[in-house]
Amino acid sequence: VKHSAWATAALAVSATVVLAACGSSHSSASSPSGSGAATASSPAGSGSAAAGSGTKTLGCMITDTGGIDDRSFNASSWAGMQAAAQANPNISVKYLQSTTQADYVPNINTFISQKCNIIVTVGFLMGDDTQTAAKAHPDQKFAIVDFSYNPPLPNVDALLFNTAQDGFLGGYLAAGMSKTGKVATFGGQKLPTVTIYMDGFYDGVQYYNQKHNKNVQVLGWNETTQNGSFTGDFTNQTKGQSVTQTFISEGADIIFPVAGNVGLGAAKAVQQADAAAGSQKVNMMWVDTDGCVSAAQYCKYFITSVQKGIVTAVKNAVTGTADGSFKGGNYIGTLQNGGVALAPFHDFDSKVPAALKSELQTVTQGIENGSIQIATKSPVSG
């Protein structure tokens, strides 16, 4: 069954968020994330942590279709590869880009033939092809970003992130910062790794409404019906600009795109709204990475970013291959283990009220200790 690891979990009316992780150790959603690379390879780093055996390790990464410089999960994954090479001088890394989904299998086979020590595939859509290759080549180590398997595969380090949690914090913050009483979110494609962010964001707004007796509305997503706004890809910035302009015209003053590079179109729309005389002030949140690093030209509009700890998770998968600690299995990044987090407020640090910051800390603690249960129809484990 296609994507069976997810489909099985998705049969439940509401899958309760999993707060535990297994497999190898990964942490820190606040790790710096790069904006991609100009070349398809990176030489071994000059870091201080040399591999004990001195054995050379080749780490190979395959992007999803958004490109290496998507300012999102591809760029973060490549930054993790480069961080591994910097940490261990015996590691070298390179990548292949997937222009379409038809490139997945040829790219995987190319790297298998090149005898890569670990092949890192990026994105939910690569789940089936990675599984097929891993089962056909049990001695080949893999890691995959944004997917997990049930049962876990011993030669695949499956890296998934419970972004319903920090999405919830983002929604709570957005509701608390909105002046119009309307906020909005949209996705690139309707995939579980996209809608889980949107579920969390939606629920965070509802929780704020409950606590403050407010009625802040969410445009672009309805968790109950699982219907909402999607641009259809992760690359078309014009679509992102258009859908954001529509939300702004409907009164939304905080926008949360879950759409990779499409989010740059949203940022352009926010920038244009800011320049329009007499218009309502509009701001936004970035996704996956700290937008003030990966899309710094729009930092003044980013209240925060709803992050995944992809950089550290990928780095650990590659360095674990080099030092012999690779375990395989499923890893779930959470608030508790540092795998997901809100980014710093940057330019908004003085604009977010102290009381709201305190509430966010309380909500974070509630999610971590289980007193706040987040339900999402997007599964977070295999």
Map each language-model feature to its residues:
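Bacterial signal peptide processing site
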Residues: 23-26
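C-terminal motif of bacterial Sec signal peptides marking the signal peptidase cleavage site
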Residues: 17-21
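A residue-level marker of the well-folded mature domains of exported/periplasmic proteins
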Residues: 31-382
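Bacterial N-terminal signal peptides that target proteins for export
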Residues: 1-10
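Short, low-complexity intrinsically disordered segments enriched in small and basic residues
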Residues: 1, 29-30
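Hydrophobic helical h-region of N-terminal Sec-dependent signal peptides
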Residues: 11-16
